[in-house]
Design a protein with these regions (language model features):
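Amphipathic, charged alpha-helical segments and their helix-to-coil junctions
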Residues: 21-186
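Sec/Tat signal peptide C-region and signal peptidase I cleavage site
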Residues: 16-20
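Bacterial N-terminal signal peptides
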Residues: 7-15
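Positively charged n-region of N-terminal signal peptides that target proteins for export
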Residues: 1-4
Length: 186
């Protein structure tokens, strides 16, 4: 009788362990994706966007066009391109060294955002510096997605190494960055 009870207990424990082993671990968050937000460091994404092949190609083409205009004596075209490039550089500085919005970079990713959101299990993306937007989401509903967005820009290896420094650095306050940029010190 004692043997039967021990055998019954052993079989019961084994069956319980086997059923438990076949259950998938629940790593999935309990919050539905629509209620979760993917947060990203806009400075890092802006840097990746700047160094992406299409952006570097565009910059080379604009510089070549400026050079051609200058050589042809077309001062108006040269001045317009120079102003455009200056504004682009200023915008980039405010995005990379501070917390300015990165609308152009996110627009480039627009077609991929639904797939990236599904991959991350989030309903939307918000800059980690956008405190007003983040107030709508509790801490446990925030998912870090910076690296997920950055990988879309397919950075060259030297630029990838620079990203870690940006992640650790504290951004300049936007007003201070604007002042430094206007003074040519950013």
């Amino acid at each position: 009788m004692k043997t039967n009870i021990l055998l019954f207990l052993f079989v019961g424990l084994f069956a319980h362990a086997a059923v438990g082993a076949t259950e998938a671990p629940t790593d999935k968050p309990t919050t539905p994706p629509a209620a979760r937000v993917g947060i990203y460091d806009s400075r890092v994404v802006a840097y990746a966007y700047f160094w992406s092949a299409p952006q570097q190609q565009m910059a080379k083409e604009r510089m070549a066009a400026a050079k051609t205009a200058k050589a042809a004596g077309d001062q108006a075209t040269y001045a317009a391109i120079a102003q455009e490039m200056k504004e682009r550089q200023s915008r980039s500085h405010l995005q990379v060294f501070s917390t300015a919005p990165i609308d152009e970079a996110m627009a480039v990713l627009n077609d991929r955002l639904p797939q990236l959101a599904a991959q991350a299990g989030v309903g939307k993306f918000v800059s980690k510096w956008d405190e007003a937007a983040l107030q709508k989401f509790p801490e446990d509903a925030r998912v870090e997605v910076t690296d997920l967005l950055v990988q879309e820009f397919k950075l060259p290896e030297p630029q990838k190494k620079m990203l870690e420094g940006f992640k650790r650095a504290t951004p300049l306050p936007l007003d201070e960055a604007r002042r430094l940029d206007a003074a040519g010190k950013l």
